[in-house]
């Protein structure tokens, strides 16, 4: 195989930020013990920030972005993998601190890789990507509420930022688990799309993007929040007793103005979802959970 490959390369000199496709030599790849022929990658919110100006996430240049990829191992210095193994990578700060997947060839730590299940194609793995992993972890967190409460049924689940990657896959997964999903979105033109994913109801974002009450009428057994800010604060105020909230995004704001009443009077639980650094065992479990996969319902 040729030692030459192409990649998107970011550079910054002073105030000048640039991005271009370059031909590189494999010696350019600095880190890792497994070399992968990249077949697919995807585009996440974080990728967009990095491609725009580094997003304050990239510390060293030149840099190859792309936080996710799937492909085949072509060379391994680690006994965990051999040539020909099909693998998936999401997170672990690849594409930020380490060179990423917007490249024909990637070289990464073996501990960052998951073997691709046989019944999931390389393309389907990137249809899911980080967004899919995060949303499935969120769905499992809400499902776990039933186990924690000895079978107390989850019925009504709210998904914010519903037209985004995490929100869209969360709707599919939660619907397949049998929950009644309500989607929050500011995009009225996407109502048919959200219903096609399984959302039973759609609420305009403006209903949530306002100052919250300390505690409100309990409406939701579970919440998947991808946006933060006032929208999350209102969702917390509206969560039913013993409800669980998966916090997995900050598209609206990093801020959260809430109070103790929903926690003390209703016993609600907030579960932060860090899919970027979760264990390999947890990743392997999630990608093997075939009946919740997005591509079975929605392949766009």
Where are these regions (language model features)?
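Rossmann-fold NAD(P)-binding glycine/threonine-rich loop
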Residues: 253-265
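Glycine-centered, small-residue-biased loops immediately flanking beta-strands
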Residues: 243
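Glycine-rich NAD(P) Rossmann-fold beta1-alpha1 loop
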Residues: 161-168
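Helix-to-beta-strand junctions that scaffold the AdoMet/dcAdoMet cofactor pocket
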Residues: 239-240
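Adenosine-nucleotide cofactor-binding segment
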Residues: 175-231
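NAD(P)H dinucleotide-binding glycine-rich loop of Rossmann-like/cofactor-binding domains
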Residues: 90-157
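Conserved small/polar residues in nucleotide/adenosyl-binding loops
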Residues: 290-297
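Glycine-rich beta-strand-centered segment in the early N-terminal region that forms part
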Residues: 27-42, 54-94
């Amino acid at each position: 195989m040729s030692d030459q490959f192409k990649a998107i390369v970011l550079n910054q000199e002073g105030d000048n930020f640039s991005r271009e496709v370059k031909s590189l030599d494999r010696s350019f790849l600095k880190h890792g013990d497994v070399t992968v022929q990249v077949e697919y990658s995807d585009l996440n919110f974080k990728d967009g920030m990095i491609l725009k100006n580094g997003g304050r996430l990239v510390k060293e240049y030149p840099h190859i972005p792309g936080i996710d990829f799937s492909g085949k191992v072509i060379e391994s210095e680690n006994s965990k993998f051999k040539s020909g193994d099909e693998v998936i990578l999401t997170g672990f700060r690849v594409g930020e601190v380490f060179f990423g997947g917007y490249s024909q060839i990637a070289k990464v730590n073996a501990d960052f890789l998951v073997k691709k299940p046989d019944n999931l194609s390389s393309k389907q793995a990137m249809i899911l990507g980080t967004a899919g992993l995060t949303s499935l972890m969120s769905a499992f967190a809400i499902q776990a509420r039933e186990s924690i409460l000895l079978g107390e049924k989850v019925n009504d689940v709210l998904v914010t930022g519903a037209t985004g990657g995490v929100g869209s896959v969360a709707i599919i997964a939660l619907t397949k688990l049998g929950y009644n999903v309500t989607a929050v979105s500011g995009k009225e033109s996407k109502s048919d799309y959200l219903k096609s994913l399984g959302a039973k109801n759609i609420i305009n974002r403006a209903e949530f993007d306002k100052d919250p009450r300390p505690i409100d009428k309990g409406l939701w057994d579970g919440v998947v929040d991808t946006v933060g800010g006032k929208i999350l604060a209102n969702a917390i105020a509206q969560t039913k007793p013993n409800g669980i909230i998966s916090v997995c995004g900050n598209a609206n704001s990093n801020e959260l103005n809430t109070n103790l009443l929903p926690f003390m009077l209703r016993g609600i639980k907030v579960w932060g979802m860090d899919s970027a650094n979760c264990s390999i065992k947890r990743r392997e479990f999630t990608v093997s959970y075939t009946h919740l996969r997005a591509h079975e319902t929605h392949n766009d």
